[in-house]
């Protein structure tokens, strides 16, 4: 997205990550979609001051290196150096949840607060911490990587290799997995009919089924909320 001086998002563009594939290809697509967003804003790249990159995993904001991102398969990826080859502007990288937390601090729900915590739910579970108006990065830039807190040692395996991590249950990915499991256990669930058009189960499927009075859908939502509360 393109953000103006008032911290307003004035244009957006998106593309699919299409994993797994080389990090260099993903970075090139990121540059293309950034330029598309600039075009959608009716601007030229010369009018843009800098480029910011938010990424899951541990990002060294000092060196511009994504040190480790298990969801993307990145290890010691020099994303800032590569991005500058595509867009010749100052470039910065930060953990995506940290970036979200700082965005809320300067222009959103945490505006006016000195300290704040932000939890992001998506492919994984991320955390961002603001203390005295500054991002708390912690040891090895992983101070708020709450998604890999183990809340059930006997739970399913996480992409990080451990079992029962917070994000195994409380991410959108985890919710989709639990929804599919519930559907196969209950062939009469309305969730089967909800996905007849495209055959895709989303993070909304169980919630929509619950609202329609579906027992299996409600059980999934109850389980999801239980683990979310436990993790928090």
PLM segments and residue spans:
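Glycine-rich phosphate-binding loop plus the immediately following alpha-helix
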Residues: 85, 93-97, 151-189
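Structural signature of FAD isoalloxazine-binding scaffolds in flavoprotein oxidoreductases
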Residues: 142-145
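Glycine-rich phosphate-binding loop and adjoining helix at the ATP-binding site
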Residues: 17-31, 35, 39-51, 57-117
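Short hydrophobic alpha-helix segments
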Residues: 13-15, 70, 139
């Amino acid at each position: 997205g393109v953000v103006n001086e008032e911290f307003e998002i004035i244009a957006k563009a998106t593309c699919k990550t299409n994993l797994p594939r080389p990090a260099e290809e993903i970075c090139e697509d990121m540059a293309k979609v950034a330029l598309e967003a600039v075009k959608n804003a009716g601007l030229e790249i010369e009018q843009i001051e800098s480029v910011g990159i938010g990424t899951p995993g541990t990002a060294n904001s000092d060196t511009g290196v994504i040190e480790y991102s298990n969801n993307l398969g990145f290890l010691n990826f020099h994303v800032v150096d590569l991005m500058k080859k595509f867009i010749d502007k100052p470039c910065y990288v930060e953990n995506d949840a940290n970036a979200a937390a700082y965005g809320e601090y300067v222009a959103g729900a945490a505006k006016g607060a000195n300290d704040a915590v932000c939890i992001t739910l998506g492919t994984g579970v991320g955390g961002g911490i603001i203390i005295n108006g500054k991002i708390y990065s912690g040891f090895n830039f992983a101070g708020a990587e709450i998604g890999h807190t183990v809340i059930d040692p006997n739970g399913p395996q996480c992409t990080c290799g451990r079992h029962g991590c917070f994000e195994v249950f409380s991410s959108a990915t985890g919710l989709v997995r639990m929804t599919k499991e519930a559907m196969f256990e209950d062939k009469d669930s309305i969730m089967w009919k909800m996905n007849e058009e495209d055959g895709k189960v989303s993070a909304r499927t169980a919630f929509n089924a619950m609202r329609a009075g579906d027992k299996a859908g409600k059980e999934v939502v109850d389980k999801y909320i239980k683990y979310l509360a436990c993790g928090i």
